[in-house]
Amino acid sequence: SEWKSLANSDWTPTFDSLRNPQKAELIQSLLREQHGICCYCEQSISEKTLHIEHLVPQSVDATKALEYRNMACSCIRNTPQNTNLHCGHKRENWYDSDYISPLEEDCESHFSFSWDGTIRPNDCTDNRAVNMIQHLALNHVVLNEKRKAALDPIIDLQMTKEQMILYAQKVTQQNSNGMYNPGFPSLFRDLIL
């Protein structure tokens, strides 16, 4: 970006020195690419509820700190003390070169969901999926409750199979702003489509 090109012998751009308007532009771009969902759990997020996640943590490889393809938006902007965390804030600096990157074309194929909102590896021998679920706390009670709540309209309305398919097709399509609402598109694709 233009901001990085300002580097000189007296100043080197760093992620910590990234400020608005460049940081806001970066967030908007990532959020558009992710269609308004967390890169890990797929819940709906906004500029006010996200943080920028480094897929390869800065502590592992500082040279990738400003690489666009190494950044994604993860849920939970602020982390109050004693909070049970999930996704990027739970992951912290954990990194395994064999982990499932949210940028992988087929990343969602590694996971399956249950109607109670829980997530599991699609194949119980898939250690990559097991590690992601564990290290990111993707079965955190808060996430399970949110996924279950996303399914509640189907359950509450006692939809027929055809109605469920129509509903799932609707919520797995991006809205006019290019965002998923209510989020969790993989949940609906796995259970219904």
Which residues are covered by each model-predicted region?
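Histidine-centered nuclease catalytic patch
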Residues: 40-89, 93-94
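Long, low-complexity, intrinsically disordered segments enriched in glycines and aromatic residues
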Residues: 82-141
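Short, charged surface segments at domain edges that flank catalytic/cofactor-binding sites
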Residues: 1-37, 61-66
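Short, well-structured alpha-helical interface segments that form or flank functional binding sites
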Residues: 25, 33-36, 47-50, 66, ...
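C-terminal, charged low-complexity interaction regions
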Residues: 124-193
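Catalytic cores of phosphodiester-bond-cleaving enzymes
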Residues: 2-9, 15-17, 24, 101, ...
